[in-house]
Amino acid sequence: MNKLELIKSSIKSIPNHPKEGIIFRDITSLTEVPEAFQATIDLIIERYKSKGITKVIGTESRGFIFGAPVALALNVPFILVRKPGKLPRETIAQSYQLEYGQDTLEMHVSSIQAGDNVLVIDDLLATGGTIEATVKLVERLQGQVKHAAFVISLPDLGGEVRLRELGVEPFTLVEFSGH
């Protein structure tokens, strides 16, 4: 079994969670298989080790799981993007639309400097709303996001197209159809 097959086979699918008609892709089952978890990190590192990345952002909360080890391997700072009220220093906020409402993300204003080449990492790419909000935060602080990495993509939900329209090249390890 190659690395991508190992990763995909390690992700459990949970039907009707969190609501009827949704199939939840559970990456916590992947982190319980050390070989699959290591393969995930290794493939992301390999992809970005020569891209001149100066910061890695992990989005709340499963982006932290994959972003932190990648940042360490690339020897660059790891930045957290969180829900409101979770970060202790001065923050900048960006709201974004959800299917039924709105949410907000924050990051420390001191985390990004002008010219930073930022890699954003999250576990799953669906509609791309979280990453679009993160890109806007970085751009407001004069950094740039040209790359975003995900363990899973749900291409039927349009996130890859949305990110490309923002000038961000998505990289995903495995895809699942549907929701």
Curated annotation (Swiss-Prot):
Its main location: cytoplasm. It is found in: Cytoplasm. GO terms for cellular component: cytosol. HAMAP family: Aden_phosphoribosyltr. One of its GO terms (biological process) is purine ribonucleoside salvage. Pfam families: Pribosyltran. InterPro entries: Ade_phspho_trans, Adenine_PRTase, PRibTrfase_dom, PRTase-like. Pathway: Purine metabolism; AMP biosynthesis via salvage pathway; AMP from adenine: step 1/1. Its EC number is 2.4.2.7. It catalyses: AMP + diphosphate = 5-phospho-alpha-D-ribose 1-diphosphate + adenine. Catalyzes a salvage reaction resulting in the formation of AMP, that is energically less costly than de novo synthesis. The keyword Translocase does not apply. Keywords: Cytoplasm, Glycosyltransferase, Purine salvage, Transferase. GO terms for molecular function: adenine phosphoribosyltransferase activity. It comes from the Bacteria. It is an enzyme of class 2 (transferase). This is Adenine phosphoribosyltransferase. Gene3D superfamilies: 3.40.50.2020. Homodimer. Belongs to the purine/pyrimidine phosphoribosyltransferase family.
